[in-house]
Amino acid sequence: MPRGVYLGFDFGYKRIGVAVGQRLTCSASPLSTIEAKAGIPDWNTIQKVITQWNPQALIVGLPTCIDDRELYTTSAARRFAKQLHKQFSLPVHLVDERLSTVEARGYLFEQGGYRQIKKAEVDSIAACVILEQWLQQSE
């Protein structure tokens, strides 16, 4: 697997968390949260992020239930991944994102309690969790 920069996405109908990571350290950092309207991403902002970071691949979290059932957002996340590949001609990998939001909320709570938990930050931290999981699994 090539060393380099990777972008992770936590897809949601209202917000899409974005993180950047690298294979060398298998770590990721939150970048931003991109607004979406009824599940339609702001493709111009996504284009800017991809142009700025020039990633090797894109990693998208795939929401599923604890018992492996798919959620209503699962098919939307798959469509988002397909659109990313079609628009940017980059490899796109899907990662089981089970409990990534719970982990992100826990991290933010540890940093400053309940008041520290802001929805936009949760989404970008969840994208970090998703991306780091993929980086560690694909090594």
Swiss-Prot record:
GO terms for molecular function: nuclease activity. Its EC number is 3.1.-.-. InterPro entries: RNaseH-like_sf, YqgF, YqgF/RNaseH-like_dom, YqgF/RNaseH-like_dom_sf. GO terms for biological process: rRNA 5'-end processing. It comes from the Bacteria. Its main location: cytoplasm. The keyword Nuclease applies. One of its GO terms (cellular component) is cytosol. The keyword Nuclease applies. Keywords: Cytoplasm, Hydrolase, Nuclease, Ribosome biogenesis. Pfam families: RuvX (PF03652). It is an enzyme of class 3 (hydrolase). It is found in: Cytoplasm. NCBIfam families: RNAse_H_YqgF (TIGR00250). Could be a nuclease involved in processing of the 5'-end of pre-16S rRNA. Belongs to the YqgF nuclease family. This is Putative pre-16S rRNA nuclease. It comes from Legionella pneumophila (strain Lens). The lineage of its organism: Bacteria, Pseudomonadati, Pseudomonadota, Gammaproteobacteria, Legionellales.
